[in-house]
Amino acid sequence: MEKLIQYCTKESLYDGAFNGKVGWHAAGMGYIIVTEEKHLIVIDGGNANDSEDFLSLIEANADGKPVVDLWIITHPHSDHDGALNRIAKTPELCARVEIREIVYRFPEEFVERNGNRSNVQANANMETVLSLTGAKAHCPELDEKVTVDSATVHFLYYPYDCRIINGIANCNVCSLIFTVQAKNKKIMFTGDANTRNLQVVKWLYGKDLKCDILQLPHHALCDTGHLDFYKAVDAAIVLEPTCIAGDRAMHSDLYCTAERARWNAFAEENAAKVYKSYEGTVEIEL
């Protein structure tokens, strides 16, 4: 049976203050796709403190020592690549899994709002991860398709022209945006994509964006989103890798009237089912 697993990260259980004064707590994100023949595609994985539990979840969905065909890192923030980093750099964890390819693309010409070029260090770190795991690097091209058994990954976006994203935020705007077409369902992954990224994808692909499942960008927070993109995807199932406090804040009077909060609310209301990661690890049949 093909299935998608949304992992309940440890930080998704955060239930404290969440506002502009204390900051927005990073919830983390991790997904596993199991194909018909039990091949594995992994997306992100959460923070370093998720490494043991996330690896155990991978093992539970494999026959024997797991072989991950593709481990996709959407962007180099620690609540997304932290688990993979910890696994790679901890010999007893690394020995428990074989990773064939790590998929990532961190353009070094990208400049953050604060002037930093954080992707330079991120790429250096990824070289270490590749060396420790023995995995091959796969830097996807625009519109590239990769098939793993019964699932086809279609890369819709990477930061191919940093001039349109330089200076507007941090490396969230470098997130890969891609779909996974399984036998009966199609999933849209957005990582922590910014509104501008979603606008570009909508411009490039238009009506071809229709999917059954949508992962809301940046933990369903109101600093991103795009109504026309959500309407084009028109997903019946919405995935929210968010924390308790973040979800509560986005639906409170503090944030719920913000334009992008309303756009995210549209995606939720348009769906038949919304899965929030803090509610627990969940499996969805594909």
Language-model features: locations:
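Thr-Gly-centered strand-to-loop micro-motif
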Residues: D44, T190, L216-H218, P241
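Binuclear metal-ion centers of metallo-dependent hydrolases, dominated by the metallo-beta-lactamase
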Residues: T9, R96-V103, P107-N172, V200-V201, ...
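Active-site metal-binding motif and surrounding structural segment of the metallo-beta-lactamase
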Residues: K38-H39, N49-Y104, L204-L221, D234-L239
